[in-house]
């Protein structure tokens, strides 16, 4: 019986890993028709940001420039100009459709992520006993490691996360999260997060080392500083 109770966190851990993926797929499919119908009915412009508006205007300017360029190169008969205008009109309609699809994508992904976060939060609260057992496993595993391996692991993680070569990885990760929420790519925001987030993590890590590790395992701090030098 105790052995069976000790193994119960394993299915719980597996469910935590796969539950976000399942929630994302199921809610995306179930919410998509409702969000599409709501957007097409309301035609709200609340979610229009400056970057999307700039992209739409750039496309319209390109279409206008193409039309003017074709008229300057040679004189079109009336029928050809009419065909050209029809083509530009079709391209404009396609641009509006793409604009609406982008907004639907933003609303759908943002709603799905909020729902996923709420469900996982409730799931974690309900599975508090399993989390306690998992925490005891992790603590026991870390306790059995030598100070050298612990210090090496801390150095490896810090170099990967906040080392001099980590900005590109942070840029990819933050860009992926940004895209997953359905927001348009924004180099300024991503660059700002990349330049500040690792610094915050580095400060938290240093505080943790000096405040927590110095109290719990002074020998580990000595080994860490020796390896870091």
Swiss-Prot record:
> Could you tell me which cysteines form disulfide bridges?
none
Q: Name one GO biological process term.
A: potassium ion transport
Q: Does the keyword Protein biosynthesis apply?
A: no
Which top-rank group of organisms is this from? Eukaryota
Tell me where the transmembrane regions lie: 7-27, 106-126, 189-209
Q: Name one GO cellular component term.
A: chloroplast inner membrane
Reactions this protein catalyses: K(+)(in) + H(+)(out) = K(+)(out) + H(+)(in)
Compartments (UniProt record):
Plastid, Chloroplast inner membrane
User: Which Pfam families does the annotation name?
Assistant: CemA
Q: How does it sit in the membrane?
A: Multi-pass membrane protein
Question: Which GO molecular-function terms appear in the entry?
Answer: antiporter activity; proton transmembrane transporter activity
What keywords sit in the KW lines? Answer: Antiport, Chloroplast, Hydrogen ion transport, Ion transport, Membrane, Plastid, Plastid inner membrane, Potassium, Potassium transport, Transmembrane, Transmembrane helix, Transport
The record's comment on protein family reads: Belongs to the CemA family.
* Function, in words: Contributes to K(+)/H(+) antiport activity by supporting proton efflux to control proton extrusion and homeostasis in chloroplasts in a light-dependent manner to modulate photosynthesis. Prevents excessive induction of non-photochemical quenching (NPQ) under continuous-light conditions. Indirectly promotes efficient inorganic carbon uptake into chloroplasts.
Question: What is the name attached to this protein's record?
Answer: Potassium/proton antiporter CemA
Species annotation? Liriodendron tulipifera
């Amino acid at each position: 019986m105790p052995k069976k109770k000790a193994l119960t966190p394993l299915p719980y851990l597996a469910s935590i890993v796969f539950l976000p993926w399942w929630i994302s797929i199921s809610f995306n499919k179930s919410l998509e028709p409702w969000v599409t119908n709501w957007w097409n009915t309301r035609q709200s412009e609340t979610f229009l940001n400056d970057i999307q508006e700039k992209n739409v205007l750039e496309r319209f300017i390109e279409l206008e420039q193409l039309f003017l360029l074709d008229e300057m190169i040679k004189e079109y008969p009336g029928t050809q100009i009419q065909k050209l205008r029809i083509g530009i009109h079709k391209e404009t309609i396609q641009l509006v459709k793409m604009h609406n699809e982008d907004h639907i994508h933003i609303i759908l992904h943002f709603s799905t992520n909020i729902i996923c976060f709420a469900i996982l939060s409730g799931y974690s609260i309900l599975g508090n006993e399993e989390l306690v057992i998992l925490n005891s496993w992790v603590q026991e595993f870390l306790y059995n490691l030598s100070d050298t391996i612990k210090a090496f692991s801390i150095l490896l993680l810090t170099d990967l996360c906040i080392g001099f070569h980590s900005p590109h990885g942070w840029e990819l990760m933050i860009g992926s999260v940004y895209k997953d929420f359905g927001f348009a790519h924004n180099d300024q925001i991503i660059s700002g997060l990349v330049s500040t987030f690792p610094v915050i993590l580095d400060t938290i890590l240093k505080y943790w080392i000096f405040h927590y590790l110095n109290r719990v395992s002074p020998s580990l701090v000595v080994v860490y500083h020796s390896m870091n030098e």
